[in-house]
Amino acid sequence: MNQVWVTGDAVVDLIPESETSLLKCPGGAPANVAVAIARLSGKSAFFGRVGDDPFGRFMQSILDQEGVCTEFLIKDPEQRTSTVVVDLDDQGERSFTFMVKPSADQFMSVEDMGNFKQGDWLHVCSISLANEPSRSSTFEAIKRAKAAGGFISFDPNLRDEVWQDQSEIQAVVMKAVAMADVVKFSEEELLFLTDSTSMAQGLQQIAAMNIALVLVTQGAKGVWRVFESQSELITGQVVSPIDTTGAGDAFVGGLLACLSRHADWKNHPVVSSAIQWANGCGALATTQKGAMTALPTQTELLRFIGQ
């Protein structure tokens, strides 16, 4: 089993509990992925920055409790932990208000990262590419991981409001896409980043980039898989969603927890199994409020997907 390094933002999500109160929940896409992997008995480590404040200490405590390695998590005394108010509609779909700009995660430096080894995975989201110095540090981490013989997983997870210059989004994010071995898009992200008007057009552009595995999630419809020049829509389990916050992160966590178990993962049996894990985790994550609350253990996941 190989280590999965995760970098970016560890966030406190404030989720409506009633008309007059907010529920404090641990979140942030990279942190969610790290916890998802750990719950599935994988090896995950988080590197990056939180504030040396109550929310930062809360996030480190959560990651430690979940079995995520936090040796390289820096508590920055000069910055504040990312805090996001999450608003849910009647269907459990969410919108975000970022309360701290810039937050501590945007100040990650090259000195913060761990030591990558052959076969390790590095998972990155685009928030860490939004501004300097985090952008340069993240691209350096990608280069170091690849040079060590590792693999790169990238989830754009676009949040326009975090970028100081939104005109940079497409070019910067597509640079990261081109460096990745595995990329997970939402349908909206694929269309935006490729300037496409249809899924087919967007997938055609991405296929030309020779990325080993591309996944495009479409919510309840399933996920498009592009692997070895073949594309296929794969459906998953149907649940009644309560809160979709973190569903995409759970999907990625399930995917990487499975892929990281295999030194030779670029084959149909492993990829198919990984997508089954990903779909199961993504579905289960929507069944309770909070991004991490319903992340399954390996036993719970295998029971859910019938293995």
Curated annotation (Swiss-Prot):
Record-linked CDD domains: bac_FRK
EC code: 2.7.1.4
Homology family: Belongs to the carbohydrate kinase PfkB family.
Source species of the chain: Vibrio alginolyticus
Name of the protein in question: Fructokinase
Enzyme class: transferase
Record carries keyword Transit peptide: no
Catalyzed reaction equations: D-fructose + ATP = D-fructose 6-phosphate + ADP + H(+)
Upper classification of the organism: Bacteria, Pseudomonadati, Pseudomonadota, Gammaproteobacteria, Vibrionales
The keyword Nucleotide-binding is assigned to this record: yes
Gene3D superfamilies membership: 3.40.1190.20
GO biological process terms held by the UniProt record: fructose metabolic process
Keywords per UniProt: ATP-binding, Carbohydrate metabolism, Kinase, Nucleotide-binding, Transferase
Molecular-function GO terms, alphabetical: ATP binding; fructokinase activity
PROSITE patterns linked to this entry: PFKB_KINASES_1, PFKB_KINASES_2
